[in-house]
Design a protein with these regions (language model features):
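C-terminal substrate-binding subdomain of Rossmann-fold SDR/epimerase-dehydratase oxidoreductases
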Residues: 1-96
Length: 96
């Protein structure tokens, strides 16, 4: 998605927000579990009642990414968490 966005910017100017999600809802707990699996470490969390004003559900609409960039997410949350974990660890090593 990010590479497709950079290619798009070669030929277009201006600012644009494009969601690079799958279009499928993912809970916070699913994200926690995905990063636990990717890192091999426990991620501390607490399940508490929703606070006033908390959004019940929200997820990305990827239609614009597909239309403008010709890009569509191919992986689920576990693979995405693993990719982010791997990338972040690589960045940390280069900055150390």
């Amino acid at each position: 998605g990010h590479v497709a966005a950079l290619r798009y910017l070669r030929e277009h100017t201006g600012l644009l927000t494009v969601n690079l999600g799958t279009g499928q809802p993912v809970s916070v707990l699913e994200m926690v579990r995905g990063f636990q699996q990717a890192s091999g470490q426990a991620v501390p969390y607490r399940v508490v009642a929703r606070r006033p004003g908390d959004v019940a559900q929200c997820w990305a609409d990827p239609a614009l990414a597909e239309r403008l960039l010709g890009w569509r997410a191919r992986h689920g949350v576990d693979r995405m968490c693993a990719d982010v974990w791997r990338w972040q660890n690589g960045v940390a090593r280069t900055l150390a």
